[in-house]
Amino acid sequence: MLQPKRTKFRKVHKGRNRGIAAGTEVSFGTFGLKAVGRGRLTARQIEAARRAMTRAVKRQGKIWIRVFPDKPITEKPLEVRMGKGKGNVEYWVALIQPGKVLYEMDGVSEEIARNAFALAAAKLPIKTTFVTKTVM
């Protein structure tokens, strides 16, 4: 699963998921899966969606993952009293704003791409839409 090789700090503040997204255009492939809602994707969810897409296209074409989980999320163990410091890092997430392209695909027909992205979208906790590359 995806996670940073090394970080400057082990734990980070919770923060807020506001603002507008960068990476809103399909730039590598021909088709893309774009986030409509706001939320966060765990490394497990990103990988599950990638596997679903890879199986759907029967390993043909190329898939790009445009998001990376770079924020550590901590949890305290069960039945532990409050206080005594911040919990341990349990998983990594990517913060997603509306308009962000999550995945891109090329080398397959639009019908296959739509089907693959529909399977991937079912694995994700945020609302998404299918987009195609705009030619200038």
UniProtKB/Swiss-Prot annotation:
| Cross-referenced Pfam families | Ribosomal_L16
Instruction: Spell out the GO cellular component terms annotated for this protein, sorted alphabetically and separated by semicolons.
Output: cytosolic large ribosomal subunit
- Which superkingdom does the taxonomy of this entry point to? Bacteria
An example of a Gene Ontology BP annotation on this entry?
translation
| GO MF terms, alphabetically ordered | rRNA binding; structural constituent of ribosome; tRNA binding
Record key words, sorted: Ribonucleoprotein, Ribosomal protein, RNA-binding, rRNA-binding, tRNA-binding
> PROSITE patterns from the xrefs?
RIBOSOMAL_L16_1, RIBOSOMAL_L16_2
| Role description | Binds 23S rRNA and is also seen to make contacts with the A and possibly P site tRNAs.
Task: Please describe the quaternary structure of this protein.
Answer: Part of the 50S ribosomal subunit.
Q: Which family does it belong to?
A: Belongs to the universal ribosomal protein uL16 family.
Entry-linked PANTHER family: 50S/60S RIBOSOMAL PROTEIN L16 (PTHR12220), LARGE RIBOSOMAL SUBUNIT PROTEIN UL16M (PTHR12220:SF13)
Q: What is this protein called?
A: Large ribosomal subunit protein uL16
Q: Give the originating organism.
A: Pasteurella multocida (strain Pm70)
Q: What is the lineage of its organism?
A: Bacteria, Pseudomonadati, Pseudomonadota, Gammaproteobacteria, Pasteurellales
